[in-house]
From Swiss-Prot:
InterPro entries: AB_hydrolase_fold, Peptidase_S10, Propeptide_carboxypepY, Ser_caboxypep_ser_AS. It comes from the Eukaryota. It catalyses: Release of a C-terminal amino acid with broad specificity. PROSITE patterns: CARBOXYPEPT_SER_SER. Its EC number is 3.4.16.5. Residues 20-39 are annotated as: Disordered. GO terms for cellular component: fungal-type vacuole. It holds the Pfam family Carbpep_Y_N. It is found in: Vacuole. This is Carboxypeptidase Y homolog A. It comes from Paracoccidioides brasiliensis (strain Pb18). Residues 1-18 form the signal peptide. Belongs to the peptidase S10 family.
Amino acid sequence: MKSLVLGLLVGSAIASGPLQHVLHAPPDPEPKPEPEPQVVKDPFEELRDTFDRLRNKAGDIWDDVMDNIPNIMSNMRPLTIPAKKFTRRPDSEWTHIVRGADLEALWVDDESGYKHRKIDGKLSQYDLRIKAVDPSDLGIDKVKQYSGYLDDNANDKHLFFWFFESRNDPFGDPVVLWLNGGPGCSSLTGMFFELGPASIDENITANYNPYSWNSNSSIIFLDQPVNVGYSYSSQAVSDTVTAAKDVYALLTLFFTQFRQYSAQDFHIAGESYAGHYIPVFASEILHHNNTNINLQSVLIGNGLTDPLSQYPFYRPMACGDGGYPSVLDSQSCQSMDNALPRCLSMIKSCYDIESTFTCLPASIYCNNALIGPYQKTGRNPYDVRTNCTGNDLCYPQLNYITEYLNKPHVMRSLGVEVDSYESCNMDINRNFLFHGDWMKPYHRLVPSLLARIPVLIYAGDADFICNWLGNKAWTEALEYPGHAKFAEAPMENLTMINSQGKNEVFGEVKSHSNLTFMRIFKAGHMTPFDSPQASLEFANSWLSGEWSEV
């Protein structure tokens, strides 16, 4: 990110110079006095002045943080992430191995006779090791399954994935990449807790999920960035842009091995911090002209995408204006109101400069001032209707999942190479935060996506942490050609035939110019967990092309 920041600073210095206007001379001009000698300022001096102004601005922001949260430095921990213990499995244990170097070496002729790479991207450092998983071994689902690792051999990074074919028509149904957020939480959590083929009960037993999203699509569950879930590395990833290169490589090598899926529609879906990931990952894919990834849309659930538009809605959601009773007392609500202007000023500084020195203070101050009061109540930040129980993530089911995925038999069946599994790696969470990634304006990538593919933003309306009010606000504020018509579009009912055979309104939707927003009633942060039938209903409708305009 240093080169990006430097580019912005240099741009600021150049833009600060005076503009020259050429005017027609008036008739019969008066004699002009001799001009004063013009002092031409050294451009490097202008650049130094710009750095000084930015340094002073960053210093003021840090002073604000230290004044308001004086113990913050004592809570900071080193950014190093302990390496996981692992045992590399021999190549003979893998069903397929795809070499990125082999793919990068392929050249083809275009219609004009010019040679170009068959597949774009720097792939030579990557391999994909794939294991065919015996469906009867774990009893998760009867469909064809694959697991394995993407290896970045140049940087000692190894990303784990688990793939399930569609229960319906695997050679006709779309393929979906699912990403959990955090940052630092395993997508296997989403698989077993929300939308995958099975859940894990208190007896640490797998139970069939009739509302799995692989009912009508094939799904790749990916543990990313490295050191999340079953993934591992001696290196650390601390920002979303770096992670995008790995995801592009994995998908490219996967579709190279499984050509039967590469012609089918492909979609990226995820929740929470995937509101950061998905715009970047989709942009990385669409950046390449010669690719075997047939990206058709993206879906972001209860995401964090545009903090400047979303953070003003923490107070309304916590204080009774989001459709549920207030969680906080009037004094706490007023405190959040008082803190908001300073918070927004800090986020704007982050947006303007996009450096750690402005984005990190914004994260620290705003999260303490606007999320902290809610967390102190003991209520579930992922569902305002409940208290937080079971563990730090408020759901005891996550403990069952962790215990299941640490079983030696499970790890052996999947070809896992690490010694243990954890659902969320808080060191990674802290690393992204301390590198300023949390507050960065990744929503600015969405307009270019909308020019090529549909984008769905959905939100369970009982979530606090990435609430529906904020998600609706940022979509309505997004600057793109369809902005005005989307903002004024009315909300319409979402309906389905429920399990009792009755017509049920489960949410509301607005859509225009490839952008769609959905509010899902009576669902929290993990929408498919709270509303499994409704989630499958809107997912199937979306993947089949409803609300798409491109």
